[in-house]
């Protein structure tokens, strides 16, 4: 949907599986899902979250590419809230700066 950012606030596994690994995790890794090739172009570890720059290539549409920023806040506990909110608030602020005017833009929504 032409989204610029994905925000994930769960671990892949906590006692049991919470989320499937739907993308590669390391810089330079590629996965192919049907006609979409997903490549991690950059990984940046912030204090409380990780940001991955992902290039999505549509192999059926002249190899058209789209950049997506994946924010992963993995400190949210299974049945609790974070003890300290600074990391979560910093993440929200960074996403807001990256996607400042979604309502009046050609880009899709932030996916949470």
Curated annotation (Swiss-Prot):
Keywords: Hydrolase, Protein phosphatase. GO terms for cellular component: cell junction; cytosol; plasma membrane. Residues 1-112 form the Tyrosine-protein phosphatase domain. One of its GO terms (biological process) is signal transduction. It catalyses: O-phospho-L-tyrosyl-[protein] + H2O = L-tyrosyl-[protein] + phosphate. Its EC number is 3.1.3.48. GO terms for molecular function: protein kinase binding; protein tyrosine phosphatase activity. It comes from the Eukaryota. Belongs to the protein-tyrosine phosphatase family. This is Tyrosine-protein phosphatase 8. It comes from Styela plicata.
């Amino acid at each position: 949907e032409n989204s610029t950012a994905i925000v994930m606030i769960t671990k892949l596994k906590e006692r049991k599986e919470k989320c499937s690994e739907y993308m590669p995790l390391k810089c330079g890794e590629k996965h192919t899902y049907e006609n979409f090739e997903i490549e991690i172009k950059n990984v940046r570890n912030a204090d409380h979250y990780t940001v991955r720059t992902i290039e999505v290539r549509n192999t059926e549409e002249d190899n058209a590419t789209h950049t997506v920023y994946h924010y992963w806040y993995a400190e949210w506990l299974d049945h609790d809230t974070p003890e300290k909110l600074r990391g979560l608030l910093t993440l929200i602020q960074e996403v807001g700066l990256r996607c400042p005017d979604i309502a009046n833009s050609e880009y899709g929504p932030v996916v949470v």
